């Protein structure tokens, strides 16, 4: 579990996030959502140590990340997997070499052990046979899967995903969501996802933190979010493309209650 308490960060005396407290549960997909400029990206960067907060406390289970020195933070980061928005693959390296990179940086295993690990994670993300391909030779969805494989190759305890569905079509996004969900459960890791994709929220959002103008505005789960009475959250939901398909059965199935269609229609139509 990751716990944050009263996290604050500003730039040039302008506050960007103010007094944010939340818990991100182990074995769950914890989503941070909000409009552009809401502070969700800065919050995630604080969580992984790319930015130092001005105030507040970050706890990784029983370890206080906020009080760690530089060397201790380096050790902690080895327990963290990162899936970047643009996949951040090395164009000059093959798929295999991209995934091997963290192992070469941080692992003392033999070359054979490293290769076995690379083969295993490639198999897990259904990319057998792609070892020798270069990023330019594979699709956007495959690049995301390479990014996921690289993010878990060191057996992290914590996984951070920054806009994992950015640039993907809806069907591929669904595949990536499902893969992140499966890996979170199988590895029993704490997964934190920064997204504005409401389909992802409904598909895999175990816990949801909604940010508004640098503050925590709402916290709950995907079964509660559609029926929330929070006006700012509802405005964010109604502004998303998600509501174009909000009456489909997928949404009702996610809520777990087919008989709530009447409530859904009332919410959408007034």
What kind of feature is each model-predicted range?
Residues 159-162:
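Catalytic Walker B motif of ABC-type/P-loop ATPase nucleotide-binding domains
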Residues 48:
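Helix-to-loop junction immediately C-terminal to a conserved catalytic motif
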Residues 153-157:
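A short, proline-enriched helix->beta-strand linker immediately N-terminal to the Walker B motif
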């Amino acid at each position: 579990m990751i716990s944050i308490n009263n996290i604050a960060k500003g730039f040039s005396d302008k506050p960007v996030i103010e007094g944010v407290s939340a818990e991100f549960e182990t074995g769950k997909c914890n989503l941070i959502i909000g409009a552009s400029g809401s502070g969700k990206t800065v919050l995630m960067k604080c969580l992984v140590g790319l930015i130092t907060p001005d105030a507040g406390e970050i706890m990784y289970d029983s370890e206080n990340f906020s009080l760690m020195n530089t060397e201790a933070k380096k050790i902690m980061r080895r327990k963290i997997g990162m899936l970047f928005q643009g996949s951040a693959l090395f164009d000059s390296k093959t798929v295999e070499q991209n995934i091997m990179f963290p192992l070469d940086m941080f692992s003392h295993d033999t070359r054979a052990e490293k290769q076995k690990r690379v083969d295993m994670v490639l198999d897990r993300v259904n990319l057998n046979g792609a070892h020798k391909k270069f990023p330019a030779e594979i699709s956007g969805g495959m690049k995301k899967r390479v990014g996921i494989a690289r993010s878990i190759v060191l057996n992290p305890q914590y996984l951070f995903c920054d806009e994992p569905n950015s640039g993907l079509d809806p069907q591929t996004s669904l595949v990536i969501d499902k893969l992140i969900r499966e890996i979170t459960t199988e590895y029993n890791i704490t997964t934190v996802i920064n997204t504005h994709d409401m389909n992802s929220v409904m598909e895999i959002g175990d816990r949801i933190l909604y940010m508004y103008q640098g503050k925590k505005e709402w916290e709950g789960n995907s079964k509660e979010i559609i029926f929330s009475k929070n006006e700012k959250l509802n405005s964010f939901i109604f502004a998303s493309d998600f509501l174009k398909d909000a009456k489909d059965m997928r949404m009702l199935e996610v809520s777990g209650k087919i008989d709530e269609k009447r409530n859904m229609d009332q919410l959408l139509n007034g």
